[in-house]
């Protein structure tokens, strides 16, 4: 007798209504500038943003200079605050300090921490590994200058969404391997870590909102032009961190979305971390789509999902 199919939950109705009203989809044929413009259309009403002390800086390390960052201080400022280095999403090709300003603010408030949001160089103008190089230089700068910001250099975490989750995972490995600042936590929102496009969620959610398979292919073509990714196990660990030795990495929270092509990628990375002895919490959000952290201020279910990751980050930083 055939087992009955268990229907998965639908997309949260408030989120679905928002996506239907303000579609942000694009195709590879549209090109990167159209994609960037569509992402910039997602704006949070200013009155919903928490008022924080914010400072623009240009940082650098070891020959890499002129990396823009935006520093956020939490509502209650005290000495030796923990520091979160945040890497925005957007397929390594879109986004920046402004598109992810609400997200950075949420991390400063939710984690009660200083947040340094990094404006790394984007593809296709600057393909891999330019963004990784900038991100690493910014993390090294934070490690050496945390005290000047009022931060505690012994309590630094990385966080990022989507491509920024990929970068955060890479940064955690580099910090372990290349003598970077010791990290206490990694918060990975719907990251891409495996580059294994054969995972079931890439087919199951091939036409999902926000991020579909066509968009994924465009991002990869812009970020790693001409690279054969058919054998994901042969990719460098700074592109596919799931290929690395994962032992000795900091604890992690991985947030995934049921209606997201990257869902199984995050789940696989969580399994690999666990097998390597790393403490990891995986939270798959059954009614969410890719990018839900960006909707936390306007969609209650997205706020609840985001809150789970921020709570884990806060616990790790204030243990």
From Swiss-Prot:
Question: Which Gene Ontology molecular function entries are recorded, alphabetically?
Answer: acetylesterase activity; carboxylesterase activity; short-chain carboxylesterase activity
Under which EC number(s) is this enzyme classified?
3.1.1.1
What is any Pfam family matched here? Abhydrolase_3
Give the pH dependence.
Optimum pH is 7.0-8.0.
Which EC class, in a word?
Answer: hydrolase
Question: Thermal effects on activity, per the entry?
Answer: Optimum temperature is 45 degrees Celsius.
Q: Which residue numbers does the motif Involved in the stabilization of the negatively charged intermediate by the formation of the oxyanion hole cover?
A: 88-90
State what inhibits or activates this protein.
Strongly inhibited by diethyl paranitrophenyl phosphate, which is a specific inhibitor of serine hydrolases.
GO BP annotations listed: catabolic process
Catalytic activity entry = a carboxylic ester + H2O = an alcohol + a carboxylate + H(+); a propanoate ester + H2O = an aliphatic alcohol + propanoate + H(+); 1,2,3-tripropanoylglycerol + H2O = dipropanoylglycerol + propanoate + H(+); a butanoate ester + H2O = an aliphatic alcohol + butanoate + H(+)
The record's note on quaternary structure and interaction partners says: Monomer.
Family assignment? Belongs to the 'GDXG' lipolytic enzyme family.
Query: What's the stated role of this polypeptide?
Result: Hydrolyzes various short-chain esters, such as triacylglycerols and vinyl esters. Has no activity against emulsified substrates.
Tell me which PANTHER family the record gives. Answer: AB HYDROLASE SUPERFAMILY PROTEIN C4A8.06C, ALPHA_BETA HYDROLASE FOLD-3 DOMAIN-CONTAINING PROTEIN-RELATED
Per its record, how is this protein called by name? Carboxylesterase NlhH
Tell me what organism the protein belongs to. Answer: Mycobacterium tuberculosis (strain ATCC 25618 / H37Rv)
Gene name as annotated: nlhH
């Amino acid at each position: 007798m055939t087992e009955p199919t268990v229907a998965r939950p639908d997309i949260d109705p408030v989120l679905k209504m928002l996506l239907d009203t303000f579609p942000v989809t694009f195709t590879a044929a549209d090109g990167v500038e159209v994609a960037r413009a569509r992402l910039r259309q997602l704006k949070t009403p200013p009155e919903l943003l928490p008022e924080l002390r914010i400072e623009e800086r240009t940082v650098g390390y070891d020959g890499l200079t002129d990396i823009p960052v935006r520093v956020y201080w939490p509502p209650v400022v005290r000495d030796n605050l923990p520091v979160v280095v945040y890497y925005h999403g957007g397929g390594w090709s879109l986004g920046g300090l402004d598109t992810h300003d609400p997200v950075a603010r949420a991390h400063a408030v939710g984690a009660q921490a200083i947040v340094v949001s990094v404006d790394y160089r984007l593809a296709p103008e600057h393909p891999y590994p330019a963004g990784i190089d900038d991100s690493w230089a910014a993390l090294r700068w934070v490690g050496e200058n945390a005290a000047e910001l009022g931060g505690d250099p012994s309590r630094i975490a990385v966080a990022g969404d989507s491509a920024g989750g990929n970068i955060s995972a890479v940064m955690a490995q580099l910090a372990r391997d290349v003598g970077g600042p010791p990290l206490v936590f990694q918060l990975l929102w719907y990251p891409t870590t495996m580059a294994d496009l054969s995972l079931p969620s890439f087919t199951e959610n091939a036409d999902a909102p926000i991020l579909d398979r066509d968009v994924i292919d465009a991002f990869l073509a812009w970020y790693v032009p001409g690279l054969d990714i058919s054998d994901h196990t042969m990719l460098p660990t700074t592109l596919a961190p799931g290929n690395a030795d994962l032992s000795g990495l900091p604890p992690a929270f991985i947030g995934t979305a049921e209606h997201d092509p990257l869902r199984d990628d995050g789940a696989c990375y969580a399994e690999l971390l666990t097998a390597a002895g790393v403490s990891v919490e995986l939270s798959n959000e059954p009614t969410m789509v890719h990018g839900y952290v960006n909707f936390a201020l306007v969609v209650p279910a997205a706020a609840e999902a985001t809150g789970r990751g921020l709570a884990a980050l806060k616990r790790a930083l204030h243990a």
